[in-house]
Structure formats: structure tokens, C-alpha cells
Regions:
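Residues at secondary-structure transition points
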Residues: 25, 29-32, 36, 40, ...
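Hydrophobic alpha-helical core bundles mediating ligand binding, dimerization, or RNAP-core interactions
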Residues: 31-53, 128-147, 151-165, 169
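Charged, amphipathic alpha-helical coiled-coil/dimerization segments
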Residues: 12-13, 96-159
Length: 177
């Protein structure tokens, strides 16, 4: 018999379990359940890339920054601080470590030389592609089990968690590509 760490969903008859939110979905217990599931889901999702992160000698914070820099090349440190809510000190340390490992390039801005812009290196872009392929496989499996309507609802909830100002900035960065 497997323990909870090695059990498959089918062992518990959960593979096709469909859950439905209570009509009282704004009650504290329901909201807490959503927070718990979000945190647990994120933890398990990121475990899929932990072996690649260890191999690259970087952590999850490094991956988050590298992912943003790859998605929006030319972001400044200030942009990343606004996006992530992380302190300048913490981001500077992570950026320096990524630069030392040859995964990002930090250079003065093209229009404003005081602005430090971050861009992925070829190695950084290749690593992000590997990491995101693993994450996509895990997400695709979860999406397939949930269905299109559930995925749409999930996206709506996640977008609701991102402040409007951040969503606007992200859209601007997308257009600026």
C-alpha cells in the first residue's frame, strides 16, 4: 500500500472527482478552502521544476525573475519591484546571481541610461523554455481534468487577484514587445 506521498489519484478514486463551489462561496470556510487549494496547487506545480532548478543551481525566486525577464525583455528593476512586490534588496541579489550564472544581461537603458534593463541570455531563454514545458505539462493535465468552463473560471479568479494597475502594466509590456 502506498502512503499519501506516493499515492496516485486513482488509488483514492479521485481522478475524475468534480468539485463544485458551494452557493455560499463567499463564506469564510469556502474562501479559506480556496486559499488552501491555491497554495497547495502552487506548491505541487512548482515541485515539477525543482529538479531542473537544482541542476541550474537556482531557486524559485530566480525562476520567477528569469520568467518575467524572458517574457518582457528590457524590464527595469523598478518594473520588477512593482510587479512582484519584492524588495529592491532581494531582487538585486537574485538579479546579480542570475547575471553571474550567465542567465540574464543587465545593461543601461537605451533611452534612459540610469535605468538598468534586464534581458535574458540565450542560456536563460533556453532554461525558461525547459522549465515552462514542464509546468505546461502539469497544467495541461489539470486543465484536461477540469474542462474549459472551469479553466475560464480559474483564470478569472487569478486575474481578480492581480491588482488592476499590474494588469495594465503587463498589457503595456506585451504591446511594447
Amino acid at each position: 500500500m502506498r502512503d499519501a506521498r506516493t499515492a496516485r489519484a486513482d488509488d483514492y478514486g479521485l481522478a475524475r472527482l468534480k468539485v463544485s463551489a458551494s452557493p455560499l462561496y463567499l463564506r469564510e470556510a469556502e474562501v479559506r478552502r480556496g486559499v488552501d487549494l491555491l497554495q497547495l496547487g502552487q506548491s505541487h506545480l512548482l515541485r515539477a521544476i525543482d529538479p531542473l532548478l537544482r541542476e541550474a543551481a537556482i531557486g524559485r525566486a530566480h525562476y520567477r525573475m528569469l520568467g518575467h525577464v524572458t517574457r518582457w525583455p528590457g524590464l527595469a528593476m523598478g518594473d520588477l519591484i512593482d510587479l512582484s512586490g519584492t524588495s529592491k534588496q532581494a531582487l538585486t541579489r537574485v538579479a546579480r546571481e542570475l547575471e553571474e550564472r550567465g542567465l540574464i544581461l543587465i545593461a543601461p537603458g537605451l533611452l534612459d541610461r540610469r535605468r538598468r534593463e534586464l534581458r535574458p541570455s540565450e542560456a536563460g531563454t533556453a532554461l525558461v523554455a525547459q522549465l515552462e514545458a514542464r509546468l505546461a505539462a502539469v497544467m495541461a493535465e489539470a486543465y484536461a481534468g477540469a474542462g474549459q468552463d472551469a479553466v475560464t473560471g480559474f483564470w478569472q479568479v487569478l486575474e481578480g487577484l492581480v491588482p488592476v494597475a499590474s494588469r495594465i502594466r503587463m498589457a503595456e509590456w506585451e504591446r511594447g514587445r
